[in-house]
From Swiss-Prot:
This is Maltose fermentation regulatory protein YPR196W. It comes from the Eukaryota. Pfam families: Zn_clus. A motif (Nuclear localization signal) lies at residues 41-49. GO terms for biological process: regulation of DNA-templated transcription. GO terms for cellular component: nucleus. Residues 8-34 bind DNA. Its main location: nucleus. Keywords: DNA-binding, Metal-binding, Nucleus, Transcription, Transcription regulation, Zinc.
């Protein structure tokens, strides 16, 4: 076996052939000092150093392909340190809106089940949803950041790892819910709705839509699944109004139980109140809105019951918090939707419009909403994505529908309130051009001229098609 000999230092620098003698002929001819101090360079494939691995993984995670059908690529896992920071943010600011697990439970999963595939991807998707909702990034190393969209794309390109069609455990369900929240923030309604449908489908496959499934589960597991079930129920009912798809989940499942906590960030008070707002109307209420029809079971009395039960806001919720905003706007929104059903039923509409007080209901709802916005910091709205602008715009639409029914004095009051509501709606970050154009067209058709030259904080990143949200 021949022994590999290296070129001398001078020949290697000059990039000339060396006879490898000591001294070599080329150095001797040119009176150069011939040395062999530089270490022998190993030939063949190089070993993969840890630093190279880290750098390659960072590049892959930043430039991950959005196409989930692309060829399989092995990614280095998102560091525990990054996930842990996201879990803390979720605990501090978002748990009250969409509660799943407390930080202690999430940290335990991170430490003990980091290598478990479905658990790991749930934690990554939760991190993605958290960063997307809060519009922030996490710095991992100097100059290298993790953003919600990067983590979301990483999850979407790795779906075959966490959803292999062999199981429908709660972690897979929560993963799809978190991804749905990401795309809602990206204003991609089609993808957001599709991902929520994936989660709802897994709920049914697992049998979590039947109360008897919960009987033999530990209380903590029951509580978690009930929270996720109602998160999806409310999501489905919201989309029923705007995507025009009938609902499938019903209130046959008991909501989660109130929990006694010393940390207000873990309180379920606002979440339970929002559940109440969404479930005071029955399933048929949302199906009627989805199909633009009112069946015989929906009466004037049932609509009045909704207004009466949701007329006074709860005093159990911490004011001017993320959960408080979610509850208030959901309450105003559902009352307005009940009014919308009145417009779809001719005999009921005639009865209501013959009553001045009933006709004035949209004005009263709008007044309540504007009162709630007076002392509320505007940054509390952004975490909810396009939901708050859509709910507020529903109230503005109701005002347009009835403003022509008023006499001169009432019309002037309604017009002033409509202007204030419109200014508020179009000052929100997630209010996009299409929403503004549709509403402006409706106002023009009703011969209403709003003194608004342009939206104040338009979001031009909406991926919604023209017909996705009417």
């Amino acid at each position: 076996m021949s022994i590999v000999r290296q070129s001398c230092d001078c020949c290697r620098v000059r990039r000339v052939k060396c006879d490898r003698n000591r001294p070599c002929d080329r150095c001797r001819q040119r009176n150069l000092r011939c040395t062999y101090l530089q270490p022998l360079r190993k030939r063949g494939p190089k070993s993969i150093g840890e630093s190279n691995l880290e750098r390659a993984a960072e590049i892959q995670m930043v430039t991950v392909n959005n196409n989930i059908m692309a060829a399989p690529v092995m990614y280095k896992k998102v560091p525990k340190k990054v996930i842990d920071q996201c879990l803390r943010l979720y605990h501090d600011q978002l748990y009250v809106i969409w509660p799943m697990l407390s930080y202690d439970d999430l940290y335990k999963l991170l430490e003990e089940n980091y290598e478990d595939c479905s658990t790991y991807w749930f934690l990554v998707s939760l991190s993605a949803a958290t960063l997307s909702d809060l519009h922030t990034k996490i710095e991992y190393k100097k100059g290298f950041f993790f953003a919600g969209e990067q983590l979301c794309n990483l999850c979407m390109s790795s779906r075959r790892f966490f959803d292999d069609l062999s199981n429908s455990d709660i972690f897979r369900i929560m993963t799809y819910y978190c991804l749905h929240r990401c795309y809602a923030q990206f204003a991609d309604t089609r993808t957001s709705y599709r991902l929520s449908c994936e989660a709802i489908g897994l709920i049914k496959i697992a049998g979590f839509h039947r109360e008897e499934t919960y009987e033999f589960l530990p209380f903590g597991e029951q509580q978690l699944i009930r929270k996720v079930y109602y998160l999806l129920l409310m999501t489905e009912r919201y989309y029923a109004v705007y995507i025009k798809c009938v609902t499938s989940l019903d209130t046959t499942i008991s909501p989660p139980q109130p929990e006694i906590v010393t940390d207000s960030r873990l309180s379920l008070d606002s979440f339970l109140e929002v559940i109440k707002v969404f479930t005071v109307p029955g399933k048929y209420f949302y199906d009627a809105l989805a199909t633009n029809s009112v069946n015989g079971s929906y009466t004037e009395d049932s609509l009045k019951r909704i207004w009466n039960e949701l007329h006074i806001s709860s005093l159990d919720i911490e004011p001017y918090s993320y959960g408080y905003i979610d509850y208030l706007f959901s309450r105003h929104w559902v009352r307005t939707l009940a009014w919308k059903l009145v417009l779809n039923k001719k005999d009921m509409r005639m009865n209501f419009f013959s009553n001045t007080n009933a006709t004035h209901i949209p004005v009263e709802i709008a007044k309540d909403m504007l009162q709630d916005t007076l002392l509320t910091p505007i940054d509390l709205y952004d975490v909810h994505g396009p939901v708050i602008p859509m709910k507020a715009l529903e109230i503005a639409n109701a005002l347009v529908d009835v403003v022509s029914k008023y006499d001169h004095n009432m019309k002037l009051e309604a017009w002033n309130i409509l202007c204030d509501v419109s200014k508020f709606v179009f000052s929100l970050k997630h209010c996009n051009h299409k929403m503004f154009q549709r509403f402006s067209t409706k106002c023009q058709s009703a011969l209403i001229d709003l003194p608004i030259s342009r939206p104040l904080r338009l979001n031009d990143d909406s991926k919604d098609e023209v017909d996705i949200i009417p």
